Amino acid sequence: MGSTATETEELENTTFKYLIGEQTEKMWQRLKGILRCLVKQLEKGDVNVIDLKKNIEYAASVLEAVYIDETRRLLDTDDELSDIQSDSVPSEVRDWLASTFTRKMGMMKKKSEEKPRFRSIVHVVQAGIFVERMYRKSYHMVGLAYPEAVIVTLKDVDKWSFDVFALNEASGEHSLKFMIYELFTRYDLINRFKIPVSCLIAFAEALEVGYSKYKNPYHNLIHAADVTQTVHYIMLHTGIMHWLTELEILAMVFAAAIHDYEHTGTTNNFHIQTRSDVAILYNDRSVLENHHVSAAYRLMQEEEMNVLINLSKDDWRDLRNLVIEMVLSTDMSGHFQQIKNIRNSLQQPEGLDKAKTMSLILHAADISHPAKSWKLHHRWTMALMEEFFLQGDKEAELGLPFSPLCDRKSTMVAQSQIGFIDFIVEPTFSLLTDSTEKIIIPLIEEDSKTKTPSYGASRRSNMKGTTNDGTYSPDYSLASVDLKSFKNSLVDIIQQNKERWKELAAQGEPDPHKNSDLVNAEEKHAETHS
């Protein structure tokens, strides 16, 4: 029994070192050995009661420490905002960050049940086939013809600088419909999942009607088209599309297209405070996000819009699970918990969970405009601020206090964007690039070591698609993925935009809506420097 006691004392001296280091597994092995030794001694009747009590108490303390540490790791989001000091960030901006990106609506923190992980086999040959088909142009398929102006605009759809506003103008305010159809065609989703073209067009048009229902300045069909294109860019240029199955790519594009369907132009908190029907329906939990998914799926109950009619039962269920998780993850109040969970996953030896990674991609795309060119970013910011101010007007009419950034007379636009970039956008895109590196680098290394690639991989590496003007699209094989360039480009653009906001903040935060000269000057400056 002495050896057991000695080992216990030694373990006590190293417990906390192991808990915070990389030798946690070793600690558990030693603790397991002690407990098994005690069991054997109990069986033999050779037990020292004092040592037995000491070891059991110690085992309990270790388990309790681990439980507390794990609970704190999963639930504590306060530290994510701990570096927002009152003397460096205006109180209004700090309140907005806290109220928007954390769940602090008077609800008790409660450990959420771990969602079942969605696991599927990565079909390499299948992936190779769909990538080879991506750039097969089908501009004049039955049911949808592309106007010449739309064809010209969509030539830039693979670029980060893609101008969705130009597409919306070229398409007669149907940017979402053409973006959905374009990507479903490029990824060969129509053929692969036997999607009736008439259903796809009817569904896309119904989505546009829903996005236009409340005439929102920001959360409208243009935003949906922008997020969908951004998701496409991320999948394409990080190589993530090589990691995903065709069903998962369908889920990504579909979720992006519907993620803000029938958005009311007001926040979840506004719905909760006004006790709206949708807040009552969803019990104040991710109110709008639940509605977006539910309403979009309700459309597909109509036969003429049922784009998923030919999916197998398993595929339909798997896709729905993915779409629900992705869209609910766009609830900004879960931002810090989502970031923390992914960051913790990166520290684990096993691979990243597909559904959670896909959710991160959609979330990043949803808040990506500060990482776009100043011309686009500034335009999106002005639209979002006007939407906030319209909510503030409603709050004033109802006698409610102004939500953060919703008072058009006092809101500091530049400061809010600086805070948004510092505490939300930069960490999100940093995590996105770290995640894609962990996923894709092993795939690139494996691909380069394969002397005789599979049929699909071989066809994928040589894939080039012919465009309308007879030229070739770029090579988007695994070998062509340049994660360093992807990361550096984002960092540079975000930094440039932040500096521009700092310049505006230094000018004294003029009201961008009352001072039209400022807005016009900014847009002219953006045009000359874009």
Curated annotation (Swiss-Prot):
Superkingdom, taxonomy of origin: Eukaryota
Chain ranges of the PDEase domain: 142-508
UniProt-annotated catalytic positions: H219
Span of the signal peptide: none
A GO molecular function held by the record: calmodulin-activated 3',5'-cyclic-GMP phosphodiesterase activity
Amino-acid positions noted as binding Mg(2+) in the UniProt annotation, renumbered to this chain: D260
EC number: 3.1.4.17
Residues holding Zn(2+): H223, H259, D260, D366
Residue ranges, compositional bias (Polar residues): 451-471
Compositionally biased spans, kind Basic and acidic residues: 510-530
Residue ranges, annotated region (Disordered): 450-471, 502-530
GO BP annotations listed: cAMP-mediated signaling
Assigned keywords, A-Z: Calmodulin-binding, cAMP, cGMP, Hydrolase, Magnesium, Metal-binding, Zinc
UniProt record similarity statement: Belongs to the cyclic nucleotide phosphodiesterase family. PDE1 subfamily.
PANTHER family (alphabetical): CYCLIC NUCLEOTIDE PHOSPHODIESTERASE (PTHR11347)
Assembly and binders: Homodimer. Interacts with YWHAZ.
Entry protein name: Dual specificity calcium/calmodulin-dependent 3',5'-cyclic nucleotide phosphodiesterase 1A
High-level lineage: Eukaryota, Metazoa, Chordata, Craniata, Vertebrata
